[in-house]
Amino acid sequence: MGVCCATAPASDRRSRHPDMQNWNVAVTDFSKTPLLDTIRTPADLRKLRVEQLRQVADELRKETIDAVSVTGGHFGAGLGVVELTTAIHYIFDTPRDRLIWDVGHQAYPHKILTGRRDRIRTLRTGGGLSGFTKRTESDYDPFGAAHSSTSISASLGMAVARDLSGGKNNVIAVIGDGAMSAGMAYEAMNNAGAMNSRLIVILNDNDMSIAPPVGAMSAYLSRLYSGKTYRSLREAAKQLGKHLPKMIADRAERVEEYSRGFMVNSGTLFEELGFYYVGPIDGHNLDHLLPVLKNVRDMENGPILLHVVTQKGKGYGPAEAAADKYHAVVKFDVSTGAQSKSKPNAPAYQNVFGQSLVKEAEKDDKIIAITAAMPSGTGVDIFNKAFPKRTFDVGIAEQHAVTFAAGLATEGFKPFCAIYSTFLQRGYDQIVHDVAIQSLPVRFAIDRAGLVGADGATHAGSFDNAYLGCLPNFVIMAASDEAELVHMVATQVAINDRPSAVRYPRGEGRGVEMPEVGVPLPIGKGRIVRQGSKVALLSLGTRLAECEKAADELAAHGLSTTIADARFMKPLDVDLVLKLARDHDVLITIEEGSIGGFGSHVMQTLAEHGALDSGQVRVRAMVLPDEFLDHDTPNAMYASVGLDDRGIVAKVFEALGKDVTTETVKLA
């Protein structure tokens, strides 16, 4: 069947499968993947013989490597679950059986097998496939993901919904050992164990942080313990124990627990949480995976945890040798593994932060760096090389990171909590309750502020201006360029009576001249970058560069424009805001954040001081739209929502009651 279909012309294959008419055959080399070519959905996979699955997995890995070499994206984790993905879709009846991938980094092979192979080379591009699972993209994605450790909670909800509805389908969560460092995963497991819900959790252990060595004995025991005979005998023993004196029954139960614990000691914690533990087994050995998954599928009672050991980057030499470098990649040469990284024109913001913190720490031994499993992404790895004893990676545990920092602050230390904006959301109660209410001087370095591009809505740093700006006694800054970031880090070091935050985007700076050392800024004071008379552009953050380009175009239209860098959202430079409103016909605020942020604070200030009463100044706030934006390049995303130079010019003309198109034609 596979050979026949693979050797037929592409047009013949499309005619046999009308639903494949839109496949982009031109960008996919099907000739190297004859069995995979026959699979449009998992239903096609399940028609194959068991002995064909090894070839399917090999071809699936080959296709994943080739696709990601074209698009870039998360890489190592997906290669590590190729066999597991193949086996799950072969054994379970997806999408009727719900399959939830935690985070979604490993979901590319899953997408290829579930009707999206034709678009796999559009991953993370505008209008293309998401880099994560997404409900609106496919019925095979029953739950969206991107942030860590949500899969077990979501799966338990689906399992309970199934039970309440009288359904019989399976619910499977696949979660990595790294995600198991988050408290939410254990909260969900504790709840699932107490409810005794029929739920399957597959622990994908790809860092060997949990598992002992695996092999034939482990595979045998996993088949034994997951088999119906053993489980029936175990259940019968439990029923018998109910009729025995309590002391004897308790001793018998302990003997059974000890015997299983002796043979499979890594399952003790999960058994205590109420899960029936199976494993560990080799996640790359289909002969081990398939029978155990079948046994697990057919279990009728209670939550089950299947422990599978895999290797990140499996099957691709460069990724196996350097898992950290191939966790996420840009486009690369498949034959060499060399990634197509262009030479930067300016330093990346996270590196500027890390280097600035090192310079400050050389003068102050109280400075501490904290990250939540993102040392290289935040620049904390730079600090760690210089001060390993003052660096703490707490794992995927943002709530703990914030309160841990608060504890350090109570003892006179100066903790810098470096966390992406989108992940800091997970520690919000701790920011309010443990930091802000107590006025503890925890310093937040908020990376990936604003739109981040290819990772889309789940990773956008859109809301921190709003969710931090409403907190009393909080200093909030935004760097307009990399030099400003250096000074803002120094400013945070000097703030010892309240919490502070500095936000900055992903990617490179502007290439401005860098200061040798950071100098603390006057708290709550902005700066005038360019003086004009007709229009005022008040920017918070890196949209300042777009304001400068917009001002040049406005000047060509005869509109003299002032550009101001707010620097501080809180405390706001009230004098500067009132002066800009008083001296100009139009005042525009620009920020890389949502409604409720900087622009709202400016409007509130103007209203409180009566600056809007006379109607002499026309004020507009330019913010991100009130919607979640799909992935694209950051520049394309900002342009699409009008937060670029053209959008700023258009907003000025709109405030003046003029048509920008007409005015541009006049100028030409």
Curated annotation (Swiss-Prot):
Pathway: Metabolic intermediate biosynthesis; 1-deoxy-D-xylulose 5-phosphate biosynthesis; 1-deoxy-D-xylulose 5-phosphate from D-glyceraldehyde 3-phosphate and pyruvate: step 1/1. It catalyses: D-glyceraldehyde 3-phosphate + pyruvate + H(+) = 1-deoxy-D-xylulose 5-phosphate + CO2. Mg(2+) binds at D177, N206. GO terms for biological process: 1-deoxy-D-xylulose 5-phosphate biosynthetic process; glyceraldehyde-3-phosphate metabolic process; terpenoid biosynthetic process; thiamine biosynthetic process. The keyword Transferase applies. NCBIfam families: dxs (TIGR00204), PRK05444.2-2 (NF003933). This is 1-deoxy-D-xylulose-5-phosphate synthase. The gene is dxs.
